[in-house]
Amino acid sequence: MIRKIPSFIKIYESLIKIPTISSLNNKLDQSNKVLIDLLSNYFSELNFLINIKNIPNTNKFNMLASFGDGKGGILFSGHTDTVDFDEHLWTKDPFKLTEKNNKLYGLGTVDMKGFFAFILDALCSINIKSIKKPIYILATANEETDMSGARYFIQSSSIKPDFIIIGEPTSLKLVKAHKGHVSYSIDVVGNTGHSSNPANGINSIEIMHLVIKKLLKLKIYLREKYFHKDFSIGYPTMNFSSINGGNAINRICALCNLKFEIRPTPGLTLTQIEILIQEMLQAIFKKWPNRIFLKNLFFSVPPYEFPKEKKIIKKIENSCQLKPTTANYCTEAPFLGKIGPTLILGPGSIQQAHNADEYLDCSFIKPTKKIIRKLIKNFCY
């Protein structure tokens, strides 16, 4: 078979070379259009149909590459964006693929632009003209910020694959479920005054103390009520991330802020969390009206679990010779899972993601290509 696209390493180099940082800081945020166009060209050379869509009100794009007709098939998905990097911590060029000590260094090597190089290489090694079910490749935007790429895709697409593989770095473990993430900020507004007469003011730190006591009760309740046996940390976690208040030792504190996060297990919805927090703090809200303000900090991600009624997971396990596991981090699975049962499976370690000198250990290369080929041959032929 004549190869129509560059070698695996050359593709990898071309993907890492293009900066695609997603950030809530507009000065750092970058469009992914150049990378989307490059991927489109690669998949076009393999006779895939290309559909590029702009995410409304952004300079970001999704790409869906499709080959074959009919129902079902496989959707391989990855995000095109990376996090920002600290140039003082990196010892290598983040945008140049560097091979050293059996490792491939570069921003996005594991998280997760490199996954597209594996898909393209695998497709070059099999005769896809003989497939009986379609193959889809999805490249999304903004996974590292608000996951707007995945959220927009499920609103604008009508495909229904048999299952979806998200190629996030799982060390080639088959992840069937992961926790969600929701973060909050609470402001308590008091009245300042001289500390020599506390009765002349309202100390926001003292009210926040009551809030924290209630949240700690909620923490225990979540741990006891929503235990999930499949997770290494089998309960929803709550973390108090920061607390700030006061500006002088002799002044009654007028403003106190607390930031905290909850990572729910599957079975605990984001709506339930919101209701539980409101119920737990209701008495304090009533006692101190218009002084306690609760808000979400960032876009929330629900927990995800592969649907128990979908028996196809057993076939996937046997095909890959892998046993399913769980993860404590988040992916696009809760959103893509709305169009098809979703698993997370990809090369590299999550420990390298978001770190300086991010790298892919080359020991993952051969087994990853083998697994992708097996999935296509076992489920699309």
Curated annotation (Swiss-Prot):
Signal peptide: none annotated. One of its GO terms (cellular component) is cytoplasm. Zn(2+) 1 binds at H79, D111, E168. The keyword Iron does not apply. SUPFAM superfamilies: Bacterial exopeptidase dimerisation domain, Zn-dependent exopeptidases. It holds the Pfam family M20_dimer. GO terms for biological process: L-arginine biosynthetic process. Keywords: Amino-acid biosynthesis, Arginine biosynthesis, Cobalt, Cytoplasm, Hydrolase, Metal-binding, Zinc. PROSITE patterns: ARGE_DAPE_CPG2_1 (PS00758), ARGE_DAPE_CPG2_2 (PS00759). It is an enzyme of class 3 (hydrolase). The active site is at D81, E143. Zn(2+) 2 binds at D111, E144, H354. One of its GO terms (molecular function) is acetylornithine deacetylase activity. The keyword Cytoplasm applies. Its cofactor is Zn(2+); Co(2+); glutathione. It comes from the Bacteria. It is found in: Cytoplasm. HAMAP family: ArgE. Catalyzes the hydrolysis of the amide bond of N(2)-acetylated L-amino acids. Cleaves the acetyl group from N-acetyl-L-ornithine to form L-ornithine, an intermediate in L-arginine biosynthesis pathway, and a branchpoint in the synthesis of polyamines. This is Acetylornithine deacetylase. It comes from Buchnera aphidicola subsp. Schizaphis graminum (strain Sg). The lineage of its organism: Bacteria, Pseudomonadati, Pseudomonadota, Gammaproteobacteria, Enterobacterales.
